[in-house]
From Swiss-Prot:
Organism: Homo sapiens (Human)
Entry protein name: Ras-related protein Rap-2c
Any Pfam family the entry gives: Ras
Keyword ATP-binding found: no
Function (record text): Small GTP-binding protein which cycles between a GDP-bound inactive and a GTP-bound active form. May play a role in cytoskeletal rearrangements and regulate cell spreading through activation of the effector TNIK. May play a role in SRE-mediated gene transcription.
Expression (tissue specificity): Expressed in liver, skeletal muscle, prostate, uterus, rectum, stomach, and bladder and to a lower extent in brain, kidney, pancreas, and bone marrow. Expressed in mononuclear leukocytes and megakaryocytes.
UniProt-annotated location(s): Cytoplasm; Recycling endosome membrane
Keyword Lipoprotein included in the entry's annotation: yes
Gene3D superfamilies according to UniProt: P-loop containing nucleotide triphosphate hydrolases
Protein family membership: Belongs to the small GTPase superfamily. Ras family.
Effector region, short sequence motif: residues: 32-40
GO cellular component: a single term: tertiary granule membrane
Lipidation (S-palmitoyl cysteine): C176, C177
Length: 183
């Protein structure tokens, strides 16, 4: 059984813990309690292949931002979460993705951009088109979720497994002869 380390990143109050706990336990956390760091494990079957996810739910507040490099260094897949009802949280996600690329030294890191709190549609500040455009720029999937109504939560974690599976496939080598002569 394959094991994957997934890191959930985003600003404070965007619903990182709510999404993670909803996925792992099937319950919604009503009360906001800022996270420093929480760790979860869950078995998941994606495309008939069993896997174990080790999910690191990180602090969203800036006072713990210095810990992010370590989380990123150890992570294999990343879920970047912003709140659909908070434009600033959408802006905050961009430097986090830049940090992932800097630490990993690789552009094609398994990553999903997530707009959370779709259940609060009347209060929306970030349009779906903005999320889609940013995901397209980054070359990653985009999803809108609701931890409260459990909308797209299981699909989100299944998709990050697919992304990690896809990135671990060996890249096709160029067709070339095995001997080269330089004169």
């Amino acid at each position: 059984m394959r094991e994957y380390k997934v890191v959930v990143l985003g600003s404070g109050g965007v619903g990182k813990s709510a999404l993670t706990v909803q996925f792992v336990t099937g319950t919604f956390i009503e009360k906001y309690d800022p996270t420093i760091e929480d760790f979860y494990r869950k078995e998941i079957e994606v495309d008939s292949s069993p896997s174990v996810l080790e999910i690191l739910d990180t602090a969203g507040t800036e006072q713990f931002a210095s810990m992010r490099d370590l989380y990123i260094k150890n992570g294999q897949g990343f879920i970047l979460v912003y709140s659909l009802v908070n434009q600033q949280s959408f802006q905050d996600i961009k430097p986090m993705r830049d940090q992932i690329v800097r630490v990993k030294r690789y552009e094609k890191v398994p990553l999903i951009l997530v707009g959370n709190k779709v259940d609060l549609e009347p209060e929306r500040e970030v349009m779906s088109s903005e999320g889609r455009a940013l995901a397209q720029e980054w070359g990653c999937p985009f999803m809108e979720t609701s931890a409260k109504s459990k909308s797209m939560v299981d699909e989100l974690f299944a998709e990050i497994v697919r992304q990690m599976n896809y990135s671990s496939l060996p890249e096709k080598q160029d067709q070339c002869c095995t001997t080269c002569v330089v004169q």
